[in-house]
UniProtKB/Swiss-Prot annotation:
Modifications made to the protein after synthesis: Phosphorylated on serine and threonine residues. Phosphorylation by PKA inhibits ion conduction.
Modified residue annotations for Omega-N-methylarginine: 1014
PROSITE patterns: CNMP_BINDING_3, PAC, PAS
Catalytic activity from the UniProt record: K(+)(in) = K(+)(out)
Intramembrane segments: 612-632
Biased amino acid composition, Gly residues: 916-927
Family the UniProt entry places it in: Belongs to the potassium channel family. H (Eag) (TC 1.A.1.20) subfamily. Kv11.1/KCNH2 sub-subfamily.
GO biological process annotation, one example: positive regulation of potassium ion transmembrane transport
Segments carrying motif Selectivity filter: 624-629
GN (gene name): KCNH2
TM spans (from-to): 404-424, 451-471, 496-516, 521-541, 548-568, 639-659
Record-given protein name: Voltage-gated inwardly rectifying potassium channel KCNH2
Pfam families: cNMP_binding, Ion_trans, PAS_9
Source organism: Sus scrofa (Pig)
Low complexity bias: start-end ranges: 928-939
Length: 1154
C-alpha cells in the first residue's frame, strides 16, 4: 500500500482555529466580510445566537453593525464608533447597549478586530461580544464609556486652546495597572500621558494632513451622532475613513500608528475642509519639536524607542502567524492611561502650524501591539489568529515530514542495516563465539576486537539516531490529519514502536564487555531482529507489484533457511564435546571430507564447510527434498528436523503456492486480451460475417486494445464523484474548449457542462466515421489527424485539425442525413457532442447561446437536402436560424397553466370580435364564437392577441344562421404557430385537412386522415383549433396524444349525430313536400293528410338549410381543410330540391347545443 500522506493539501484553517479556541471560552462572535456591501455577516457562532435570541439564518447576511439589535437606549455615538472602526479597518472596543429578540436590553462590550490576507489587505472582521451587565440592573450610563471627545463648538474662532479632559471611565478601567488621580496632570515625558495640541485656526492643509469630508453639523460629527441613513451609508461606503471619530481608543485598544494611517484615535472635525487639522504621531516631546522645525533632525532617541522603529511598518495591524513567531519574545503591552493635559500652552499657541500632534509614551514593544492585542483579546495563546488564506499544515521547527525525501532515504538506509543485522547477528551468535581458532589468533583480545564489531558499533549508533528522528517525524492520525506537534508525536511513538526500537538499539557488547559472557552477548544481540517487524510493515506498500512480491517471498524463504542453518549448527556444536559415540552430524561431516575431530575436540571441518553444509540441510528439508547425505542422528537433531519440516510445509504452501498467482497476475493483461479476442472471433463465426468486414472488426479491436490496454475509460471515469468527473472532462477537452472560437467567453460552469457532454473518439486509418445516408445526430470537432469526405468515389473535402463537420443544428427540423462518407486518413482524435446534449446545455445557458451560434462555423455541412423532400436548403437553415431559435426560446418560456383534468375534452376558446378587416369574426348571439371550416385569411391571424394561445378550449353552441351569401368566419391559430409555419415543425400541420370529414359523401371520408408533411406548404396554415401549442421539449408527449384521442372521439360522435340528423331532415322533407301531378294527369292535389300524419316540426326552406344549418352543424369541429389549388368546395344537398316552408328547422335532441 502507498504511504499515508494524510491531508497535506493547503487548507483554510481560519474558521476552524477561531472555533477551536473560542468553544472552550464561551465566546460570542461573528465574522463579517469586509469586501461586500455593509460588511455582511458570513458566520456567527451558537453563543452569539443564544445571546441575541436570533437564529443563524436570521443573522446571516445582516450588516455587522448589528443594527437589528439597536433599540431606544442604544447610544448613537457608540454605533457610529463601530461603523467608523469597520470603515477604517481599525481595532476598537466599544461599549454599547443592545436589545435581544425578546426585547430585553443588555450592556455589551464589542471588540472589532480586522483580519488580513497574505497581501495585508483587510478582508474580514471579527466582532467579539462580551456581556457587561443586563440593562435593567443599571440606569442610563452617566459616564462616557466610549471615550469620545466633547464638542468643541464653544471655542472662539481663530483662537487656539489647550484643554484638560478627565476620563473617569478610562481611569476606572485602567486603575488596576496605572491608577491616576482625577485631577492629576501629566507631563510631556510621563509614560502615561498623551499631549494634545488643538489649533482650530483656519489654515491650508499640509502635505501630511488627513483630508476630512465637509460636514454640516460639527456637534454631531464630533460626537459621532448622525442619522441612521448616514451611518448606513458610512458602512456601505467603499472608501476608507479620513480619521477616526473619537479622541483616543479604549484602554486595551491604544495602538498608535506612526505613519498616521489606520489611527484608532478620534479627531474633532471642523466645519470646512480648509480648517481641518491633520494627524501625526510622535513618541516623545522632542519628536514634536522636530516636526515643528520641519527641516531640523530629531534629537537622539532612547534605545528602547528607536531600536524597533524600522520594523514598525511591517508589523502594524498584523495578524499573521509569521510576524508573531519572529517577535515572540517581546513582552505584552501594559495598560496605558491617556490623559489630555495642559502643557506649555504659550509656545504651542504661538505655533503657526495647524497640525494636531498626538504624543504617545515610549514603549519599546509597540512594534507588534496590534498582533498582541488580537492575541490578548481573542485569547489565542500560542496559536495566534491565522491569516484568511490557504495554508499548508503548520510544521514545527526541526520536524520531519513522514513523506519527505529525506525520510524516504533514511528509511532505506535503516532497511539495509536491519537486513545486515538479520543476516550477521545469528551468524555471529552461532559460528563466531568460542571458536578455538579465533581464540588462538588473539588470546588476549575479546570478541569486540573482531572486524564485525566495528560494523556492529556503527549499526548501534545509527539505530539510536533513528530513535531520535522518530521523535521528530510527523504521523497521520485517525482523522487523516498530519500531526506535527512534538508532544503528540512523542506520545504516539511511546505507545508504538519505541520499546522495540530501544531494545534493538542497546549495545549489549559494550555494556557487558570484559565480563567473559560472550555467549550471553551473542544471544542478547539477537534482539535486533525485532526491527524486522517494522521492516515487514514498510515493505507491505510494495505488495501491489507482482515481481516485488515474488522477490520478497524468495528473500524471506532464504532468510528463514539461514536462521535455521545457524540453529542446526548450534545444536551440533553444543552436543559435539559431550558425545562419546561421535554420531553427530559434525563428526559425520568431518569423516566425509577428511577433517575428523581429534580426541581433544580440536580439528574438524572449517567454518565455511560447516555453514554451507548446514544451509544445504535446511534448504533440502524446507523444500521436502532430502538426499540423506546429511542426516540427523541424535534425538536433538531429529526433533529439530521435525520442526524444520513443519515450517517447510508452511513455507512451501504460502510462498510457492503464491507463485502461480503472481505469475498469473503478471500475464493477466495478455489473458484478458486473448479472452476478448476469442469472443470477437466467436461473434464473427456465429453471425457469419464476411471477410472484409471481419478484417475490419479484428483490426479495430487490436488497435483499440493497444490504445486503451483493454480498460474501459468511461467506467473508470464514472467511478469518481460528479464534481471530479467535470474537472477530469474539462482537462481532457481543454485544448478544444480553449482554442475553438465558439467556446471562447463561456463561463466556467458552462464549460464544465459542455465538457461532461463531449465524448472522445479515436479512429485508425481507413475507419469510416459516418456513412452516406446516416442520421447526423452529432457535431464533430477534429483535434488530431485528418479525414476525407467522399461522395461515391470522389473526394469532396479533406479536413484536419480544428475543423468542424456535421450539420447546422435546427431547433425544429429533424436530424438530417449525411450526403457522403467520412473516412479517417490517419490516426484521428475527434470530440463529438450529440445535438440533444448541445441544445440542452445551450438552453441552460442562454447568455452563451447567442455567442455560440454567431461564432459557430461548420467547415463542411454534411446535410443532404435532396434526401428529405420539402426540406429547406442549407442556406435557408443558416440564414433563418437565429430567428427560429429565438422563436423557440420565447415559445419555451411561456407558462402553460391549463387546469385540464384527465378525461376532459379541451374546449374552444372565445373568439375575438373583428378577427379580420372583413369582419368575418363579428357574429351575434352565443353562436358567434364558432369556428369556420374554411380557410381563414392571413389578416385575421395578424390580429391575434398575445394571450390567445393559452386560452382554454371549450365547446360552444351553434350560432344563429348567417346570411346565405356569407362564408362563416373562424379564428386562426396563435401568432406563434402561424409565424412558425415556414419551419419544419412536426406539429404545424397536425390539424390540417380535418374539415373535409364533415362532407356528406364518401369521397370526403377517404381524406379524413392525411399524412402530415415534413414541412408545411408555403400557404399560411389555417387556424381551426385554438389549442396552445408548445415546444415538444416542453409539453409532454402524452398531453398531446390525449388531446388527439379526445378530439377523435368527439369527431366520431359528431359524425354519428350528423348522419342521424340528415336522415331525419330527409324524412321531414319528404313528408312536407307538395305532390305535383304530371301535366297529362287530371289528378288534383290532395288536401292535407290526417292529423296523425301531420309533421310535428315545421322546416325551413331548402336554401336556408343548405347554407346555414349544415354549416352550423359542421362548426362543431374547429378545423380547416388543407389549402388546395382549386376553389373551396361548397356543401350542398344532392338533387334538385323544391321550395319548402319558411318555418325554421329545430335542432335534434342529441345536438350538444340543445
Amino acid at each position: 500500500m502507498p504511504v499515508r500522506r494524510g491531508h497535506v493539501a493547503p487548507q483554510n484553517t481560519f474558521l476552524d482555529t477561531i472555533i477551536r479556541k473560542f468553544e472552550g471560552q464561551s465566546r460570542k462572535f461573528i465574522i463579517a466580510n469586509a469586501r461586500v456591501e455593509n460588511c455582511a455577516v458570513i458566520y456567527c457562532n451558537d453563543g452569539f445566537c443564544e445571546l441575541c435570541g436570533y437564529s443563524r439564518a436570521e443573522v446571516m447576511q445582516r450588516p455587522c453593525t448589528c443594527d437589528f439589535l439597536h433599540g431606544p437606549r442604544t447610544q448613537r455615538r457608540a454605533a457610529a464608533q463601530i461603523a467608523q472602526a469597520l470603515l477604517g479597518a481599525e481595532e476598537r472596543k466599544v461599549e454599547i447597549a443592545f436589545y435581544r429578540k425578546d426585547g430585553s436590553c443588555f450592556l455589551c462590550l464589542v471588540d472589532v478586530v480586522p483580519v488580513k490576507n497574505e497581501d495585508g489587505a483587510v478582508i474580514m472582521f471579527i466582532l467579539n461580544f462580551e456581556v457587561v451587565m443586563e440593562k435593567d440592573m443599571v440606569g442610563s450610563p452617566a459616564r462616557d464609556t466610549n471615550h469620545r471627545a466633547p464638542p468643541t463648538s464653544w471655542l472662539a474662532p481663530g483662537r487656539a486652546k489647550t484643554f484638560r479632559l478627565k476620563l473617569p471611565a478610562l481611569l476606572a478601567l485602567t486603575a488596576r495597572e496605572t491608577p491616576v488621580r482625577p485631577g492629576g496632570a501629566g507631563s510631556a515625558g510621563a509614560p502615561g500621558a498623551v499631549v494634545v495640541d488643538v489649533d482650530l485656526t483656519p489654515a491650508a492643509p499640509s502635505s501630511e494632513s488627513l483630508a476630512l469630508d465637509e460636514v454640516t453639523a460639527m456637534d454631531n460629527h464630533v460626537a459621532g451622532i448622525g442619522p441612521a441613513e448616514e451611518r448606513r451609508a458610512l458602512v456601505g461606503s467603499g472608501s476608507p475613513p479620513a480619521c477616526a471619530p473619537g479622541p483616543h481608543p479604549s484602554p486595551r485598544a491604544h495602538s498608535l500608528n506612526p505613519d498616521g494611517s489606520g489611527s484608532s484615535c478620534s479627531l474633532a472635525r471642523t466645519r470646512s475642509r480648509e480648517s481641518c487639522a491633520s494627524v501625526r504621531r510622535a513618541s516623545s516631546a522632542d519628536d514634536i519639536e522636530a516636526m515643528r522645525a520641519g527641516a531640523l533632525p530629531p534629537p537622539p532617541r532612547h534605545a528602547s524607542t528607536g531600536a524597533m522603529h524600522p520594523l514598525r511598518s511591517g508589523l502594524l495591524n498584523s495578524t499573521s502567524d509569521s510576524d508573531l513567531v519572529r517577535y515572540r519574545t517581546i513582552s505584552k503591552i501594559p495598560q496605558i492611561t491617556l490623559n489630555f493635559v495642559d502643557l506649555k500652552g504659550d509656545p504651542f499657541l504661538a505655533s503657526p502650524t495647524s497640525d494636531r500632534e498626538i504624543i504617545a509614551p515610549k514603549i519599546k514593544e509597540r512594534t507588534h501591539n496590534v498582533t498582541e492585542k488580537v492575541t490578548q483579546v481573542l485569547s489565542l495563546g500560542a496559536d495566534v489568529l491565522p491569516e484568511y488564506k490557504l495554508q499548508a499544515p503548520r510544521i514545527h521547527r526541526w520536524t520531519i515530514l513522514h513523506y519527505s525525501p529525506f525520510k524516504a532515504v533514511w528509511d532505506w538506509l535503516i532497511l539495509l542495516l536491519v537486513i545486515y543485522t538479520a543476516v550477521f547477528t545469528p551468524y555471529s551468535a552461532a559460528f563466531l563465539l568460542k571458536e578455538t581458532e579465533e581464540g588462538s589468533q588473539a588470546p588476549d583480545c575479546g570478541y569486540a576486537c573482531q572486524p564485525l564489531a566495528v560494523v556492529d558499533l556503527i549499526v548501534d549508533i545509527m539505530f539510536i539516531v533513528d530513535i531520535l528522528i522518530n521523535f521528530r517525524t510527523t504521523y497521520v492520525n485517525a482523522n487523516e490529519e498530519v500531526v506535527s506537534h512534538p508532544g503528540r508525536i512523542a506520545v504516539h511513538y511511546f505507545k508504538g514502536w519505541f520499546l522495540i526500537d530501544m531494545v534493538a538499539a542497546i549495545p549489549f557488547d559494550l555494556l557487558i564487555f570484559g565480563s567473559g559472557s560472550e555467549e550471553l552477548i551473542g544471544l542478547l544481540k539477537t534482539a535486533r531482529l525485532l526491527r524486522l517487524v517494522r521492516v515487514a510493515r514498510k515493505l507491505d506498500r510494495y505488495s501491489e507489484y507482482g515481481a516485488a512480491v515474488l522477490f520478497l517471498l524468495m528473500c524471506t524463504f532464504a532468510l528463514i533457511a539461514h536462521w535455521l542453518a545457524c540453529i542446526w549448527y548450534a545444536i551440533g556444536n553444543m552436543e559435539q564435546p559431550n558425545m562419546d559415540s561421535h554420531i553427530g552430524w559434525l563428526h559425520n561431516l568431518g569423516d566425509q571430507i577428511g577433517k575428523p575431530y581429534n580426541s581433544s575436540g580440536l580439528g574438524g571441518p572449517s567454518i565455511k564447510d560447516k555453514y554451507v553444509t548446514a544451509l544445504y540441510f535446511t534448504f533440502s528439508s524446507l523444500t521436502s527434498v532430502g538426499f540423506g547425505n546429511v542426516s540427523p542422528n541424535t534425538n536433538s537433531e531429529k526433533i529439530f528436523s521435525i520442526c524444520v519440516m513443519l515450517i517447510g510445509s508452511l513455507m512451501y504452501a504460502s510462498i510457492f503456492g503464491n507463485v502461480s498467482a503472481i505469475i498469473q497476475r503478471l500475464y493477466s493483461g495478455t489473458a484478458r486480451y486473448h479472452t476478448q479476442m476469442l469472443r470477437v472471433r466467436e461473434f464473427i463465426r456465429f453471425h457469419q460475417i464476411p471477410n472484409p468486414l471481419r478484417q475490419r472488426l479484428e483490426e479495430y479491436f487490436q488497435h483499440a486494445w493497444s490504445y486503451t490496454n483493454g480498460i474501459d475509460m468511461n467506467a473508470v471515469l464514472k467511478g469518481f464523484p460528479e464534481c471530479l468527473q467535470a474537472d477530469i472532462c474539462l482537462h481532457l477537452n481543454r485544448s478544444l474548449l480553449q482554442h475553438c472560437k465558439p467556446f471562447r467567453g463561456a463561463t466556467k460552469g458552462c464549460l464544465r457542462a459542455l465538457a461532461m457532454k463531449f465524448k472522445t473518439t479515436h479512429a485508425p486509418p481507413g475507419d469510416t466515421l459516418v456513412h452516406a445516408g446516416d442520421l447526423l445526430t452529432a457535431l464533430y470537432f477534429i483535434s488530431r489527424g485528418s479525414i476525407e469526405i467522399l461522395r461515391g468515389d470522389v473526394v469532396v473535402a479533406i479536413l484536419g485539425k480544428n475543423d468542424i463537420f456535421g450539420e447546422p443544428l435546427n431547433l425544429y427540423a429533424r436530424p438530417g442525413k449525411s450526403n457522403g462518407d467520412v473516412r479517417a486518413l490517419t490516426y484521428c482524435d475527434l470530440h463529438k457532442i450529440h445535438r440533444d446534449d448541445l441544445l440542452e446545455v445551450l438552453d441552460m445557458y442562454p447568455e452563451f447561446s447567442d455567442h455560440f451560434w454567431s461564432s459557430l462555423e461548420i467547415t463542411f455541412n454534411l446535410r443532404d437536402t435532396n434526401m428529405i423532400p420539402g426540406s429547406p436548403g442549407s442556406t435557408e437553415l443558416e440564414g433563418g436560424f437565429n430567428r427560429q431559435r429565438k422563436r423557440k426560446l420565447s415559445f419555451r418560456r411561456r407558462t402553460d397553466k391549463d387546469p385540464e383534468q384527465p378525461g376532459e375534452v379541451s374546449a374552444l376558446g372565445p373568439s375575438r370580435a373583428g378577427a379580420g378587416p372583413s369582419g368575418r369574426g363579428q357574429q351575434g348571439g352565443p353562436w358567434g364564437e364558432s369556428l369556420s371550416s374554411g380557410p381563414s385569411s392571413p389578416e385575421s391571424s395578424e390580429d391575434e392577441g398575445p394571450g390567445r394561445s393559452s386560452s382554454p378550449l371549450r365547446l360552444v353552441p351553434f350560432s344563429s344562421p348567417r346570411p346565405p351569401g356569407e362564408l362563416p368566419g373562424g379564428d386562426p391559430l396563435t401568432e406563434d404557430v402561424e409565424k412558425s409555419s415556414d419551419t419544419c415543425n412536426p406539429l404545424s400541420g397536425a390539424f390540417s385537412g380535418v374539415s373535409n370529414i364533415f362532407s356528406f359523401w364518401g369521397d370526403s371520408r377517404g381524406r379524413q386522415y392525411q399524412e402530415l408533411p415534413r414541412c408545411p406548404a408555403p400557404a399560411p396554415a389555417p387556424s381551426l383549433l385554438n389549442i396552445p401549442l408548445s415546444s415538444p421539449g416542453r409539453r409532454p408527449r402524452g398531453d398531446v396524444e390525449s388531446r388527439l384521442d379526445a378530439l377523435q372521439r368527439q369527431l366520431n360522435r359528431l359524425e354519428t349525430r350528423l348522419s342521424a340528423d340528415m336522415a331525419t331532415v330527409l324524412q321531414l322533407l319528404q313528408r312536407q313536400m307538395t305532390l305535383v301531378p304530371p301535366a297529362y294527369s287530371a289528378v288534383t292535389t290532395p288536401g292535407p293528410g290526417p292529423a296523425s300524419t301531420s309533421p310535428l316540426l315545421p322546416v325551413s326552406p331548402i336554401p336556408t338549410l343548405t347554407l346555414d344549418s349544415l354549416s352550423q352543424v359542421s362548426q362543431f369541429m374547429a378545423c380547416e381543410e388543407l389549402p388546395q389549388d382549386g376553389p373551396a368546395r361548397r356543401l350542398s344537398l344532392p338533387g334538385q330540391l323544391g321550395a319548402l316552408t319558411s318555418q325554421p328547422l329545430h335542432r335534434h335532441g342529441s345536438d350538444p347545443g340543445s
